[in-house]
């Protein structure tokens, strides 16, 4: 019953797995139950364990060239098995590899009313300037839409509408400027 109300479904799959039959069946079940297909975000975890696992670069905390090729193959396969509006992303959470990219993708995938609240709970080391700017922009857009909806409920003379539009822009600018204090 709650599926249609979910802002985003983050589906974690192991990058070092080969069999996704149970995930495919569950994905199809959720779609049949009313989950919005555009709300799925697929993430490959354990990127550091993908073949050849012994080549993971512990110093740089990143995959080797051969592992990058393996991840590209797995990513393409998962994207085919689980169509999504968003790209499939690989991460190695224990070492923090690709987590800022995941956060950025997640923030872009969320509806505008959820971005700031979610972003405020992200650890500093996983934040990116791009994700922060997107959260601030969607916050301003949401305020603008709310303001416009409130003004549209009433009949105002043209001169007052002009003043309200000016006030709207200033209010939005002020709140976006204060965004990091609010969230």
For the regions a language model picked out, list residue spans one by one.
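A generic secondary-structure signal
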Residues: 29-33, 77-78
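Canonical P-loop GTPase G-domain recognition
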Residues: 38, 47-117
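C-terminal-of-GTPase-core extension/linker across diverse P-loop GTPases
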Residues: 83-85, 89-165
């Amino acid at each position: 019953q709650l599926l249609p109300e979910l802002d985003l479904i983050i589906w974690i799959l192991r990058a070092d797995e080969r069999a996704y039959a149970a995930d495919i069946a569950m994905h199809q079940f959720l779609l049949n139950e009313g989950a919005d297909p555009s709300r799925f975000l697929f993430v490959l975890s354990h990127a550091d364990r993908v073949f050849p696992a012994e080549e993971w670069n512990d110093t740089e905390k990143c995959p080797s060239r051969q592992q990058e090729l393996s991840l590209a193959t797995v990513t393409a396969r998962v994207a085919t098995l689980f169509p999504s509006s968003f790209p499939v992303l690989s991460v190695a959470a224990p070492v923090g590899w690709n987590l800022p990219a995941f956060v950025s993708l997640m923030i872009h995938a969320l509806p505008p009313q959820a971005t700031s609240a979610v972003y405020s709970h992200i650890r500093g080391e996983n934040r990116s300037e791009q994700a922060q700017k997107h959260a601030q922009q969607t916050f301003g857009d949401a305020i603008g839409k709310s303001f416009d909806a409130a003004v549209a409920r009433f009949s105002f003379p043209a001169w007052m509408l002009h003043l309200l539009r000016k006030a709207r822009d200033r209010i939005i600018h002020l709140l976006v400027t204060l965004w990091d204090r609010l969230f």
